[in-house]
Amino acid sequence: MHTKVYVSEDRTKVFVLFYEAACVFSNFYPSGFEAKPVENFLKDTEKKEKLLKFTCSEQYFMYNKALLVGDMDIAEQILKETNPMKMKLLGRKLSMTKEQLKLWSQKSKDVMYRACLEKFSQNEDCRMILFRTHGMKLVEASPTDKIWGIGLDKADQRCEDERNWRGSNWLGEVLDQVREELWTRQEFKSNREQILKESLETRCQILEHFSH
């Protein structure tokens, strides 16, 4: 089970706990999309307007991190890479000044939002799963990440109470924001109407058993 759904007894709180790469909410999940680089990160005006192909949201995220640093060699390596973990490791190899680290910490959440927005707007299967979390709270149950995740494994009962979380859950927050943005778009009205016909039990079951 790549996703675990926790529903409180009074049904006022529903957490969708995820982490593994095989889960649609993971940045490693294979989901091709096209997007432009972040405008302010790229000096080449011609490339700014060019749509690039990405295989997953991790690739877009790390590619733009390399652009911010100005390391075009690593940026191109990330674009050519097909393994999400290797994309992440290439991003970690970047040599960043204190100023660049500070800027990236300020901009990274916005870059992740753009990556996820393109991923879910351009992939209907992924979007339908995301829409099934409407009214729920997405939670990256990474036991090791206290910024993008909550610092707890999804099997840990402490996940059921936000007061026990050991991380900020940035990725979960971004995904919640992306879902709400796409949910209101007229072009996805039929998707929305289909989800609204499903019971909470049906949605939870699909979320916990969805496979690529």
UniProtKB/Swiss-Prot annotation:
Origin superkingdom: Eukaryota
GO BP field: antibacterial innate immune response; defense response to Gram-negative bacterium; innate immune response
NCBIfam families, alphabetized: ribofla_fusion (TIGR02464)
Name of the gene: irg-1
Role played: Plays a role in innate immunity by conferring resistance to virulent strains of the Gram-negative bacterium P.aeruginosa via the zip-2 pathway. Can act independently of several immunity-related pathways including pmk-1 p38MAPK, dbl-1 TGF-beta, kgb-1 JNK and bar-1/beta-catenin pathways.
Pfam short name (any one): NADAR
Identification of the protein by name: Protein irg-1
Tissue expression: Expressed in the intestine.
Keywords, alphabetical: Immunity, Innate immunity
Induction description: Exposure to P.aeruginosa upregulates expression, in proportion to bacterial strain virulence and dependent on zip-2, but independent of several immunity-related pathways including pmk-1 p38MAPK, dbl-1 TGF-beta, kgb-1 JNK and bar-1/beta-catenin pathways. Cadmium weakly induces expression in a pmk-1-dependent manner. Induced by translational inhibitors such as cycloheximide and exogenous or P.aeruginosa-derived ToxA, in a zip-2 dependent manner.
Organism: Caenorhabditis elegans
Matching InterPro entries: NADAR (IPR012816), YbiA-like_sf (IPR037238)
SUPFAM superfamilies xref list: YbiA-like
